[in-house]
A protein has these predicted regions:
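Active-site alpha-helical elements of protease catalytic centers
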Residues: 70-86
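A short glycine/serine-rich beta->alpha loop
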Residues: 60-71, 112-115
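Positively charged n-region of N-terminal signal peptides that target proteins for export
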Residues: 1-7
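Post-signal peptide N-terminal segment of mature Sec-exported envelope proteins
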Residues: 31-37
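Active-site-surrounding "flap" and adjacent substrate/cofactor-binding loops of secreted or lumenal enzymes
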Residues: 82-113
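Bacterial N-terminal signal peptides
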Residues: 7-17
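Predominantly the structural core of cysteine protease catalytic domains
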Residues: 23-29, 41-45, 49-54, 80-84, ...
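General secretory precursor processing signal
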Residues: 19-21, 77
Length: 273
């Protein structure tokens, strides 16, 4: 066996081991469907004049992909990265700061009285809390899964006020999502997901449509960071680390979005201090 074949076999073995380890990692969800509230500014009427581009890809402009681990903090991961992105976009010259996702997750559960449970939360509650309280630096309340029940320290609350969401809008249609992305604004959304989402990899990172009579395994919040009209795909960022999917991302068919549009809960954070 020549040297090149040996190298290829070793690389293939390493890839298989990586895929096996990836599939064995715990996966958590945590999105609670929207039940209505006071944070309701519709995106469509305010930005109807925005031109929808043929394609958009914001991946290179976003902070590194987060990892929620084994707790249901997906909403705080999505709102956190959207806040970080909007903060930098609204303040040219600043760098990404990485908000405390554990802080956002705690405040999102305060609204529903479940701070002692790993209950997940609604996107609107996490946004409303971040409008009121802001989000501190990750270093002031680090992401330690075992600490999800603990109230953040006073210093975290003081620092959080430096970074607040100023404007957030509800995106109600796929065209709303495309218009937001055409304005370089990512979209945080929650949707029912199925077992197949846990099996995506570098080589297979397109989310399949659920089979007939297949049951959802939960609700999950993610972030749309692009789309392609050419093959009717959304580019979606997850919070299961960069080892999942293709560097932490997947492709979601427009068909999937349209199928669940009435259940999908989507938000655009356009301005942050």
């Amino acid at each position: 066996m020549n040297t090149m074949i040996k190298i290829l076999l070793i690389a293939l073995a390493g890839l298989c081991a990586c895929i096996a380890a990836q599939s064995a990692e715990p996966r958590a969800f945590g999105w609670k469907p929207d039940v209505g509230g006071v944070v309701d500014k519709a995106f469509g009427p305010r930005f109807r004049g925005a031109t929808i581009k043929e394609s958009v890809d914001l991946r290179a402009k976003m902070p590194p992909v987060y990892d929620q681990g084994a707790i249901g903090s997906c909403v705080s991961q999505g709102v956190g990265v959207a806040l970080d992105y909007a903060h930098v976009k609204s303040n040219p010259g600043l760098k990404f700061f990485t908000p405390s996702r554990l802080f956002i997750y705690f405040q999102g559960r305060v609204a529903i009285g479940t701070v002692n449970q790993d209950s997940g939360c609604q996107i609107r509650d996490a946004i409303a809390a971040t409008q009121k309280l802001g989000a501190p630096l990750e270093s002031l309340w680090p992401y330690r899964e075992s600490k999800f029940k603990a109230k953040p320290p006073t210093a975290a609350y003081s620092d959080a006020l430096k970074r607040q969401i100023i404007q957030a809008y509800k995106a109600e249609t796929l065209d709303d999502v495309k218009r937001a992305l055409s304005l370089d604004l990512p979209v945080v959304f929650g949707v029912p997901v199925y077992r197949s989402i846990m099996d995506l990899s570098w080589f297979n990172y397109t989310l399949p449509m659920p089979a007939k009579n297949e049951r959802s395994v939960g609700g999950h919040a993610m972030v749309v960071v692009g789309y392609r009209n050419s093959d009717s795909m959304l580019i979606v960022r997850n919070s299961w680390s960069s080892n999942w999917g293709r560097s932490g991302h997947m492709l979601m068919p427009f068909e999937y979005w349209n199928k669940f549009q009435r259940q999908t809960d989507a938000w655009v954070i356009s301005v942050a201090e």
